[in-house]
C-alpha cells in the first residue's frame, strides 16, 4: 500500500480526511481529475458519501468489472448502509418507490426471474426489427429541425432530436402514450437532479407510481400490442411480478429508456462537433457509426457509477471490503483506464471500445443496451449526412451542462448550419 493510499483512507473506516464523493466533472467531456490519481495510487480507496458514511470507490477497469461480477455484492437499495449520493433515511429506504425494488434494486433469484421475463424483448433480433421505425423517427425529427431553421435562428438539438427520438421509441415499445411526454420528462428531470429535496423526490415518485398504476390497470383489463401488455399477459401464468412491481418496472423502463440515450445523443453530437477530424471520418464512412457509438459511450460515460453493498468480506487490490460496507464502481474512471484503452483521454471512433463498462457489467448490465446502440447508430449515421454543415451556435463554455444530475449531459444544445 502506498503512502497516498493510506492518506485517503484505504484502510480507515471513519477518517475525517476522506475525499468527498461525488466529485465535480470537468466539462465538457471529462470525468473528475481525481480518478486518474486513484487509478495509479490505489484503485480501491475510500471516500465520504453525502450521507456522512464512507464507501469504497473502485476506479480501475479490471477492478470495476471484477466487483460488478462478484456474487458477494448486492444491489438491494433498501439495505441500511447502501451508498447513495442523496441523503436518505432508513425509513425512506423502506418506503422506496417500486422501481427501487424492480430489476436494478434486486439480487438473484428475484432479479434472475425478473430479467428472464424481459430479456427476450431486447434481443439483437427483436431490436433489429425496430430499425425501420427508428430510422423513420430520426428522419422525421431532422425534417422538423430543417423546417424550423427557416426561421433563421439556432435550433435546440436536445429539444428537437436528442430527447424526442428515444422518448418516442420507448413509448411505442412499452405502450405509453407519447402525448404524456411532458408529464414524465418533467418528473424525470426532478428525479435525476441531485439537489432535489427528499420530500419533492418522494412526491414526484408517487406521481409516477400513480400514473403507471393506472396504465398497468388499464392494460390488464384491455391488453394492447406492446411490451407492457405482453409482460402482463405472461405474468398471469408465471406470477413473477406483483402489481406494484409491474408498476415499478414500467417506470424504470420508461425513465431509463429515454433519459440516458437522449444525453448520449446530445453530448455525443457535441463531442463530434468539437472533434472535427472524428466527425469527418464518420461523414466519409457512415459504417463507422456503430464503432462511433461505442467510443462515445466509453468517452462520455454519462452514468458516473454503479452502487452496491458487500454481503461478505471481499479482498480486492490489497484492500478488504467488509460485509455491510458500501461500494461505488466508477464506470467513468474505468472507461478512462490506460490499461484497458490506449490513449484513453482521446476520442477515437475507430478504436475497438466494445469492452467499455458504460452499460455496467455482470448480471445488472443494461437490459436495453441493444436498443440504445441501435438508436445511436441511426442518429449518428443520419444526422451528419442530412445536415453536413451542422455547427455549434454558441461557445462551448456557455452551454448548460448537467453538473447537478445523476446522468450527465447538456440541458440545451443550440446548433445551426
In which residue ranges do the predicted regions lie?
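Cytochrome P450
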Residues: 1-417
Amino acid at each position: 500500500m502506498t503512502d497516498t493510499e493510506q492518506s485517503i483512507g484505504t484502510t480507515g473506516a471513519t477518517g475525517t480526511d476522506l475525499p468527498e464523493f461525488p466529485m465535480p466533472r470537468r466539462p465538457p467531456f471529462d470525468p473528475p481529475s481525481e480518478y486518474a490519481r486513484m487509478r495509479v495510487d490505489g484503485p480501491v480507496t475510500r471516500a465520504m458519501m453525502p450521507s456522512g458514511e464512507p464507501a469504497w470507490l473502485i476506479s480501475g477497469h479490471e477492478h470495476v468489472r471484477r466487483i460488478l461480477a462478484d456474487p458477494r455484492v448486492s444491489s438491494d437499495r433498501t439495505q441500511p448502509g447502501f451508498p447513495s449520493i442523496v441523503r436518505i433515511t432508513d425509513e425512506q429506504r423502506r418506503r422506496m418507490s417500486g422501481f427501487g425494488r424492480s430489476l436494478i434494486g434486486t439480487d438473484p433469484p428475484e432479479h434472475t426471474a425478473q430479467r428472464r421475463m424481459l430479456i427476450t424483448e431486447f434481443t439483437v433480433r427483436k431490436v433489429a426489427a425496430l430499425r425501420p421505425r427508428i430510422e423513420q423517427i430520426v428522419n422525421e425529427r431532422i425534417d422538423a429541425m430543417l423546417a424550423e431553421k427557416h426561421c433563421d435562428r439556432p435550433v435546440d438539438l436536445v429539444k428537437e432530436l436528442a430527447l424526442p427520438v428515444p422518448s418516442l421509441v420507448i413509448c411505442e415499445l412499452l405502450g405509453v402514450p407519447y402525448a404524456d411526454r411532458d408529464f414524465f420528462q418533467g418528473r424525470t428531470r426532478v428525479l435525476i437532479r441531485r439537489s432535489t429535496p427528499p420530500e419533492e423526490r418522494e412526491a414526484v415518485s408517487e406521481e409516477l407510481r400513480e400514473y403507471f398504476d393506472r396504465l398497468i390497470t388499464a392494460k390488464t383489463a384491455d391488453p394492447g400490442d406492446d411490451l407492457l401488455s405482453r409482460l402482463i399477459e405472461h405474468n398471469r401464468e408465471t406470477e413473477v411480478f406483483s402489481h406494484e412491481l409491474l408498476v415499478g418496472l414500467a417506470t424504470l423502463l420508461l425513465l431509463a429508456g429515454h433519459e440516458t440515450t437522449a444525453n448520449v445523443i446530445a453530448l455525443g453530437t457535441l463531442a463530434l462537433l468539437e472533434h472535427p477530424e472524428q466527425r469527418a471520418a464518420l461523414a466519409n464512412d457512415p459504417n463507422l457509426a456503430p464503432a462511433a457509438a461505442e467510443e462515445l459511450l466509453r468517452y462520455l460515460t454519462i452514468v458516473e457509477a454503479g452502487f452496491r453493498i458487500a454481503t461478505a468480506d471481499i479482498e480486492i487490490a490489497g484492500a478488504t471490503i467488509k460485509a455491510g460496507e458500501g461500494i461505488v464502481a466508477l464506470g467513468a474512471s474505468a472507461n478512462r483506464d490506460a490499461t484497458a484503452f490506449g490513449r484513453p483521454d482521446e476520442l477515437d471512433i475507430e478504436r475497438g471500445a466494445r469492452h467499455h463498462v458504460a452499460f455496467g457489467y455482470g448480471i445488472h448490465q443494461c437490459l436495453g443496451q441493444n436498443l440504445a446502440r441501435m438508436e445511436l447508430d441511426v442518429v449518428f449515421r443520419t444526422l451528419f449526412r442530412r445536415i453536413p454543415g451542422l455547427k455549434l451556435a454558441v461557445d462551448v463554455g456557455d452551454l448548460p451542462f448537467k453538473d447537478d444530475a445523476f446522468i450527465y449531459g447538456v440541458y440545451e444544445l443550440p446548433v445551426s448550419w
